[in-house]
Design a protein with these regions (language model features):
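Peripheral terminal and linker regions in Fe-S/redox and tRNA-modifying enzymes
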Residues: 1-137
């Protein structure tokens, strides 16, 4: 997904969010494997394949209590594009765009603290995954 800065279909600038997320994860020293491949689409067109990602994000808006709608991303969790095992993940909430990098950092830190990669940790402790995500939705 090339994002809303170029694509006329885009609702959110997925490339900008990706750059901020990568920077935050690197600055937090999240080890390789603590997070899966993350797919970010700026709209519902799914150019990144966010529905079939272990963690995917789809550009949208989210109401701010007592205010105007703010840039946000719907969160998809648990999808797979593996041959013979492909399936869509579940939509589990919406995170404000500005909080998306922090969400990924916290998920990566939790998997790393458990001494496991994302796949092992998220399968072994889905309640921890959901608890972290609940703070952001």
């Amino acid at each position: 997904c090339i994002g809303a800065s170029i694509c006329q279909q885009g609702v959110r600038d997925s490339q900008s969010v990706l750059q901020r997320a990568v920077q935050a994860v690197r600055e937090a020293n999240i080890p390789d494997g603590a997070l899966p491949k993350v797919c970010i689409s700026g709209c519902t067109s799914s150019c990144s394949g966010h529905q079939a990602a272990a963690i995917g994000f789809q550009g949208t808006v989210k109401a701010v209590p007592g205010g105007k709608p703010a840039p946000a991303f719907a969160i998809f969790l648990g999808g797979s594009d593996a041959l013979g095992h492909a399936h869509f993940g579940d939509t589990i909430g919406t995170v404000y765009e500005e909080q998306l990098p922090a969400l990924l950092v916290e998920l990566g830190q939790a998997a790393a603290a458990a001494g496991q990669n994302w796949q092992t940790w998220s399968a072994a402790d889905p309640d921890a995954v959901n608890s972290i995500i609940a703070k952001y939705v």
